[in-house]
From Swiss-Prot:
Protein keywords: Coiled coil, Ligase
EC number: 6.-.-.-
HAMAP family linked: BshC
Primary gene name: bshC
Keyword Coiled coil appears in the UniProt entry: yes
Name the record gives this protein: Putative cysteine ligase BshC
Function comment: Involved in bacillithiol (BSH) biosynthesis. May catalyze the last step of the pathway, the addition of cysteine to glucosamine malate (GlcN-Mal) to generate BSH.
Sequence similarity: Belongs to the BshC family.
Pfam families: CC_BshC (PF24850), Rossmann-like_BshC (PF10079)
NCBIfam families for the chain: thiol_BshC
GO molecular function: ligase activity
Coiled coil (UniProt feature): 419-440
Length: 543
């Protein structure tokens, strides 16, 4: 396995400026993404955490999920008052979801290893599974390659009426439907020496799981059995039981948090920074979980009542405090308060985030301060593109630059290739013929114009019909060229499908199953063990 660093520019100005440590953006963060360790450690050493309670809660989850010994050992290190953590997180995607979920795990593991060696204290890699999310449409599918070099969405047909209403962890886990979905995915795989083993692994993990979050966790543990990755489900009752005090703080400071977030978002947008986050002064940034209505986002109305959008529920602040104390499992965080809850629970040395997370965390600094917290340093996750040998040979065959193809695709190169093969200059000839026809036809249009509007319109339609026939011939001629070079066109399309599928990065579309099918179940562990990847870089992995 050969690795090559690659520089790819992001289109998000905020993220670019953050990576460049630009002062115009860094004012929205408490730390730089580099050289933050000593300052952050000093801060963490002055805080206390419910370490024993947290380890006990996660230990229950690990035992349920059959966590490997290495993960158990790492988890137990958090009891040490000196121990800190590197944290990342993601939704519970099927078979982990897109590749970038795996890349986050790799980033967390590698950064934890680096910092433990550098600082000489235990640094625990923690991956936070967002089981409280309810948007099932974001996790219920993957993409598979088709014979015409396209990526097709394969969606899990979950029939539950709760899909999209209840949190993913609470959603009915329809194993039969998921088995059908798994078979559909494996039908798209080319048979290799690893296919049967991977299929058996997935079926075993599926049969032993009782929720989508557990399916995700068990799968990740299989991919990283020796790396000590600690997994937790943010919606697990075991975790909720130690969050009561933190929910009470968020309830108390609701107005301040809401106003601070809205003010910062407005400021960011005024500075023309793109951030896909909206907030209103009345937003509570907490969810309530109702058996009938599912997960509902709470707001605070002008009378100080905590209500849902449709006003089906109404709570006084005292009633909500009582829920936090007696039934914390009925509450959960949204995208605004989840980072703060994470900070309350875990002594976080650094948070590993993608571009979207860096963008929305930029709105949270003042809210953190309201809860007497400092935002953790945010380290951009590592990004990868995998290139198989055949695709690599195609790049060489057509003398294409991989960075350019990843960034902009192959369409311009494919068009130039076909233009070079078009020795008869079909398009140029067609345009000349159309111009000549229009000139020859003009006397007829002039005569028609003198006879009235109806006959004038008829003459113009007549010209249009003739030119359309010429266009039809142009298409047929170009199609003949495409037939002649169908193999080459297919090769261009393959490079696009592999390197820039659906007009985006490979890691946002492809599932890790395809990389495992090429190189084995341990391919990602091999990457972590045998290679050091610089943070903030994109890397090419030559398979």
């Amino acid at each position: 396995m050969k690795t090559t660093p690659l520089s790819i520019q992001t289109t998000n100005k905020l993220v670019t400026n953050y990576k460049n440590n630009d002062a115009s953006v860094m004012k929205y963060f408490d730390y730089s993404s580099i050289h933050y360790e000593q300052e952050r450690l000093a801060y963490l050493n002055n805080r206390t955490y419910k370490r024993q309670d947290f380890v006990k809660a996660v230990h229950k989850l690990h035992k349920k999920w059959g966590a490997p010994e290495a993960s158990m050992e790492k988890l137990n290190k958090l009891v040490d008052e000196q121990a800190v953590a590197v944290v990342g997180g993601q939704q519970a995607g099927l078979l982990s979801g897109p590749l970038y979920s795996i890349h986050k795990v790799i980033s967390v593991i590698q950064l934890a290893k680096e910092q433990e060696k550098k600082l000489g204290i235990p640094v625990v890699p923690i991956f936070w599974i967002a089981g409280e999310d309810h948007d099932f449409d974001e996790i219920n599918h993957t993409y598979v390659p088709t014979t015409d070099m396209k990526m097709k969405k394969v969606k899990l047909q979950n029939k539950s009426i709760d899909a999209g209403r209840k949190s993913v962890t609470d959603l009915e886990f329809e194993k039969d439907k998921l088995r059908e979905w798994v078979e559909d995915v494996f039908l798209s795989l080319k048979e290799t020496d690893y296919t049967q083993d991977i299929h058996s692994l997935v079926q075993t993990v599926l049969s032993e799981s009782d929720s989508y979050s557990e399916f995700f966790a068990k799968f990740i543990f299989q991919l990283f059995p020796d790396q000590g990755i600690v997994l937790l489900d943010s919606h697990a009752s075991e975790i909720r039981e130690i969050e009561t005090d933190f929910f009470l703080e968020m309830i108390e400071h609701q107005q301040g948090i809401s106003s601070a977030v809205k003010s910062t978002i407005d400021e960011l947008k005024a500075e023309e920074y793109s951030i896909s986050l909206d907030a209103l002064d009345g937003d509570a940034h907490l969810f309530y979980h109702d058996e009938q209505l599912g997960r509902v986002l709470l707001q605070v109305d002008p009378d100080g009542m905590w209500v849902d959008k449709q006003h089906n529920m109404r709570f006084t602040v005292e009633e909500l405090r009582s829920i936090a104390i007696n039934s914390p499992h009925l509450l959960s965080n949204n995208v605004i308060t989840r980072p703060m809850m994470q900070e309350k629970l875990i002594p976080t040395l650094a948070f590993v985030g993608g571009p979207g997370e860096i963008a929305y965390w930029s709105a949270l600094k003042d809210s953190f301060h309201l809860l007497e917290l400092k935002m953790p340093p945010i380290v951009p996750r590592i990004s990868f593109t995998y290139i198989d040998r055949y695709t690599s040979r195609l790049l060489d065959k057509y003398n294409l630059n991989v960075s350019e193809i990843i960034s902009t695709g192959v369409n311009d190169h494919k068009r130039r290739f076909l233009d070079e093969k078009n020795n008869d200059n079909i398009d140029e000839v067609v345009e000349e013929v159309k111009a000549q026809i229009s000139d020859i036809h003009k006397p007829l249009r002039d005569i028609s114009a003198s006879m009235g509007d109806d006959i004038k319109a008829l003459s113009e339609s007549n010209l249009s019909y003739i030119l359309n026939d010429v266009e039809f011939l142009r298409k047929r001629l170009n199609n003949e060229i495409r037939k002649t070079y169908a193999k080459e066109i297919s090769e261009f399309d393959r490079m696009e499908m592999i390197l820039r599928p659906n007009n985006g990065l490979q890691e946002r579309i492809w599932n890790p199953i395809y990389i495992m099918n090429c190189c084995g179940v341990d391919v990602f562990t091999e990457m972590v063990n045998n290679h050091t990847f610089v943070q903030e870089e994109h890397w090419i992995i030559h398979l």
